[in-house]
Every structure is written in structure tokens, then in C-alpha cells.
Amino acid sequence: MLKVEPIPAFQDNYIWAIHDGRNAAVVDPGEAAPVERFLKDKGLALGAIVITHHHGDHQGGVAELLSAYPTTHDGAPMPVIGPAGERIGGRTQAVREGDTVTLPAPALQFRVLDVPGHTAGHVAYAGDLPGVGPVVFCGDTLFATGCGRLFEGTPAQMLASLDKLASLPGETRVYCAHEYTRSNVRFARAVEPGNTALADWEARVESLREAGQPTVPSTIGLERQVNPFLRSREPTVREAVKAQGGSVAGDAEAFGALRGWKDNFR
């Protein structure tokens, strides 16, 4: 049986630890110190490092972790798994769409999805974890009620990436890398003020944050109901985009206008 736990980092990052009570894989360790504290507090050995994309707040802790944990519990070189299309320090396994990642300790398997948009080579890791169920670790592509900025990709690429993630089973838990949900919900409410599922989710988000709890993971099923970036083809979203002066001439244009609105939303 596995557990997935957040390791807070920086101001609003989540490094994800997947562990079996003995060994842990960490996803997107932007800094090392919080990971080292977590491992020590839980009595865990580091078994693998998994990276979704090249930004420093996702891989900045890799070198320090490799210095502290050069090998796994059985003496093998520490695996560092990351996207083939990006520069990842210390990477031992380059992955792309269709690849399978298999780890011995903790015992788990992921299939790799190419999800360009936020960065050109961004990947996500989807799997079915014993004791957890279906999951996707999606970095900065899909957020709870939002999506990542388009730093390197196009609206068409990001839309296709989000469509790919939205096609996962509804019960899939979405482990994104930032606690942006409150601000994302504010924007979503501006886009779809009549969305009752979103109103319910807003109340839940406020309750969680007031209690100091993460709003992540969400689920793919919930995101389909409340996330404007998964709903950019909905008439309500299209009308809101048009009211802001955005083009809805095509799917990519409408998505790009929606993303541009969010970029400037206050």
C-alpha cells in the first residue's frame, strides 16, 4: 500500500512524496531541505526522483539530494527520471509519451504523457497506485481549477494537453505542483458565475484553506465541472470570453483568449 503526501516548499509549491512506509519517490523537488526533513521525520529512504519539467522550482533540489542520497537503499545509483525534451540535471532516465516508468522501491509504475504548453517538453505521470487509486502528477500543466501559463508552448498545444488529461478517468486524483486554487477559483467564478458546482467547490476551498489544509489533490471529474480551461468549449465560457473582447473563432483561439484573460486578471 502506498501513500502520497505533500511536502510544502517555497511560498506555494508542493513536492509530492509517494512512499510505502520505507522508501519514497519524490516528484518535482524544487528544493532539497524540505525533502530531507520529511524523509528524516518519516524514517524513509529516498528511492527515486521524478521531474515533470525543467523550471528551477521543480528540479532545483536535485543536485543537493543526489549529494545526500547518491544511491538507493540497495546501493543502486539514485534514479532521476525526467522529460527527454528538456535539460534536467542528474537525469538517469529520459522519458516521453508512451514510456513506462517502473520503480522497485517504492514499487510503482507510471505511464508517461507528453503535455507541452507550460514548457515545450513538459510531461505528466499517470498510474494506479495501490492504496491510492488512479493518479496523475501533472506539474504545472493542470492546476486545481486552472492551468499553467504558456511560457514556451502555444494555446493549441496546451489545449491538446489539457484534453489529454481530461480524458483520464473521472476518479483520477490530480497532483499538481502549486497551491493556486483560491485565486484560480476567483477567476473561474468571473468566467462562470452561474456554475453551481463551482460555487460548492469555492466553499470547500475556503474551508480547507482556513483550516491550513491543501486543496490538492482534486480529481479529473471535479475539474471537468469547475475548471474553465477544461470547459473552454462550453457556451457559457465562450460567451464570457466574447464579452471580454476575446476571439472564439476556433477552439485554440478561444482557449488562448481565456488564458490571456487569466494572465491579466486581478
Swiss-Prot record:
Its cofactor is Zn(2+). The gene is gloB. Binds 2 Zn(2+) ions per subunit. Zn(2+) 2 binds at residues 57-58, 140, 178. It comes from Cupriavidus pinatubonensis (strain JMP 134 / LMG 1197) (Cupriavidus necator (strain JMP 134)). InterPro entries: Clx_II_MBL, Glyoxalase_II_hydrolase, HAGH_C, Hydroxyacylglutathione_Hdrlase, Metallo-B-lactamas, RibonucZ/Hydroxyglut_hydro. It catalyses: an S-(2-hydroxyacyl)glutathione + H2O = a 2-hydroxy carboxylate + glutathione + H(+). This is Hydroxyacylglutathione hydrolase. Its EC number is 3.1.2.6. Belongs to the metallo-beta-lactamase superfamily. Glyoxalase II family. SMART domains: Lactamase_B (SM00849). SUPFAM superfamilies: Metallo-hydrolase/oxidoreductase. Monomer. One of its GO terms (biological process) is methylglyoxal catabolic process to D-lactate via S-lactoyl-glutathione. GO terms for molecular function: hydroxyacylglutathione hydrolase activity; metal ion binding.
